[in-house]
Amino acid sequence: IYGHMFRKFGEVDEYKPYFNYNGDYIPERSSHTFVKGFDQIAWLLNEIKVNPNSSRLILSNWDPKVSTKTPKEAVLPCCLTLLQFHVEELSESERKRWLDANYEGGGLKAIVDYCDTGVDVEDEYRKEEIQEHGFGNLLNHYSVPKAKLSSQLYQRSSDCTVAGGWNITQMCLLTHLIAQQSDLAVGDFVWTTGDIH
């Protein structure tokens, strides 16, 4: 249900068959209602690119129509209610740590590889370039993210023994995927629940 809510929030696809008083099905009096849903993931990815400092970077799973239906009509209302994202710039030292953790051989090897022109690792021009630009060219050369993506989950209800760990894992993975698609490093994940049992 979470994937459907993230990609097709509010979508309605209902067919109401019409039967006359004898119980005969009458197709021409039946009705079909379709309302296209809203793709929250596509919207979020675009919003991160055009407005990364927005406080509205939110995915919502809560649909009041679902929670008011009788148990026979509805599936269980979503436990993962709201996921909010926050983009924060990385300092140069944080970018260096990211390079060190993510470049095979570490950040020092990345510096040596970047400076190595094939002639001499001690090439003065390359050393001066790195010093002059404060590692900026080096970090950009290796596509080191300039910002990180953090997220906070508000979970309406959490059954820890059945799904709690799985729910947290799902949303952490989703945060990683969105960060990857947005060329961002991964920041913090904060979890809040209203009812834990």
Residue ranges of model-derived segments:
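Terminal, non-catalytic protein-protein interaction segments that mediate quaternary/complex assembly
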Residues: I1-H197
